[in-house]
Curated annotation (Swiss-Prot):
InterPro entries: Ribosome_recyc_fac, Ribosome_recyc_fac_dom, RRF_sf. Transmembrane segments: none annotated. CDD domains: RRF (cd00520). It comes from the Bacteria. It is found in: Cytoplasm. Belongs to the RRF family. This is Ribosome-recycling factor. Keywords: Cytoplasm, Protein biosynthesis. The lineage of its organism: Bacteria, Pseudomonadati, Thermodesulfobacteriota, Desulfovibrionia, Desulfovibrionales. One of its GO terms (molecular function) is ribosomal large subunit binding. GO terms for biological process: cytoplasmic translational termination. The keyword Glycosyltransferase does not apply. It holds the Pfam family RRF.
Amino acid sequence: MDMDSILLDAEERMEKAIAALEREFSRLRTGRASASLVDGIKVDYYGTPTPISQVASVAVPDSRCITIQPWDRNAFSLIEKAILKSDLGLNPVNDGKIIRINIPPLTEERRKDLGKMARKYAEEAKVAVRNVRRDANEQLKKLEKNKELSEDDLRKAQEDVQKLTDRFVAKTDEKAGAKEKEIMDI
């Protein structure tokens, strides 16, 4: 592996850390209904943990309601239990044909908790980015040790890796700030 491919690999892996952060953020509840809120919830469907979207259709008729229409009558109670077990603080209402989830406005306390969760997810993404930096630097040092890279090139490559890291850490902070602002907006 040469210096350029190590840098490209590091950038790709850092992009994946940001993408994972965005997925986590999409599951964090804000004041609005969103189908992605229930994406992470798994239903114990015939003994197999299955995403809700694979056993029912999920719709968002308005900004305060999510509707879930199971394709199998046996799935109603399973979906209801899975939603109640999730730590989203949602209360499903089952009328026999459809499961409705009304999204209540967030309390100040719940907003603060969600803000903390957003910061935690952002910190995990930063740790992932820094781990990628460490791996890239180790690979670069191996190249230098094997005389495939000069000391000057090593230093320059490590500076490039650090610039990449700084850019992705800043991106993480930016996304975390935007998500916290979205959570705190009433």
